[in-house]
């Protein structure tokens, strides 16, 4: 609730507060829907969730659809495009000497997976609350987003999702961000696609401590997080293992394989 009070034009502050707050993270509003979703599951009272957070969640969807923030918008294909010069807008946000190390400008895979999940979840809540105005306004969006997501991110030959897509096309760096398209409650991809994605992630990114942020096969890979600030920032999301990612990896596998994956999940 503290963060909700700081919501502005569909964004939460990344760092700072008040006049010094930096609203430069496109991830946070998308994860807000996930957080409310998890709270809803635990509480078991969707009516309370809608009453407390429905209007705020609506305002986020509207802000992205209408493009109220420079460089952040929902395109005609239903996907979220994000680009601001000199800024890294996703969680891979290291910047060295004014240049994003992992820029990912354009359509980012996890942002659009989270966007699909958010829209689907909001429609579920709206149906339970009988908010027919919202339903009429958004009911066609899930199919549009799902179709566009697959057409934009899926690459059949290697069998995984592009990390991001811009004017130059798909960026096929093997990164963990695609895991969220497999782990979220509402997923825009098929089970067959999930299986293929998870095989690639398991083969190239899985470690006993978490998931690598980049495949060791990639020439940009940094196997050690060390050195001065610039050197560490250059490795921060270019190979460094992040433990928090293992949660989505386990969740994705449990959704796909059920109890069959439990022994492996316990080992992780």
Feature annotation, model-predicted:
Residues 1-89, 109-112, 116, 240-258, ...:
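Aromatic-rich carbohydrate-recognition surfaces in CAZymes
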Residues 12-31, 35, 73-104, 156-180, ...:
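Carbohydrate-binding/catalytic loop surfaces
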Residues 13-14, 65, 69-76, 116-225:
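Catalytic cores of carbohydrate-active enzymes
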Residues 36-39, 96, 120, 143, ...:
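Intrinsically disordered, low-complexity regulatory segments enriched
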Residues 52, 56, 104, 110, ...:
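Secondary-structure junction/capping motif
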Residues 94-105, 170-207, 232-268:
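Aromatic (Trp/Tyr) and acidic
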Residues 107, 122, 129, 256-257:
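A generic structural motif
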